[in-house]
Amino acid sequence: RKGAPVQQTVQESAKGRSKDRKNNKERTDDRKMREAAEEFLLTKLGISSAWMARQSGMLIRFGEWLYLAPEEMISMEGLKVLRPGLCLLADRKNRFEPAHALALSLDREDTDRVRELTKEEAERYLHGESIPCLEERGWTLLTYEGYSLGFGKASGGQMKNHYPKGLRKSR
């Protein structure tokens, strides 16, 4: 700038470079997070590549949640947005957990990790109880009569319940 002290111009320039470095780091972190999320969807949840291919959009982070937002979405800057798209995953303590909304968006054919529940098992699941299982460890889409109910996590012969507490039926 004309007439500005050299010292001030150098400091502003350094601030600009550090801001650029910070933005580059955030972009790199976002890219790594997106790659890790896609890996989780494909390997840990067994989501089919066909389902992934049908989903057009961009992964965005909104708090601790990862959403699939439409490609043509406008900027949310200055807006109060409740949910910017389909909620896919929560990023908790350096691990991902699938969102209930993701489970409801899936059909049986969309994942290879699916279990059809009996009426009694479905009732127990909707009440928030664990279900005995023979499945290997990991996340499983639980369905009843072909409809997705939510996710469970198999561990130690039990299907741990991950049905949202606010939706659980009381006895």
Model segments located where?
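Polybasic, low-complexity RNA-engagement segments
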Residues: 1-171
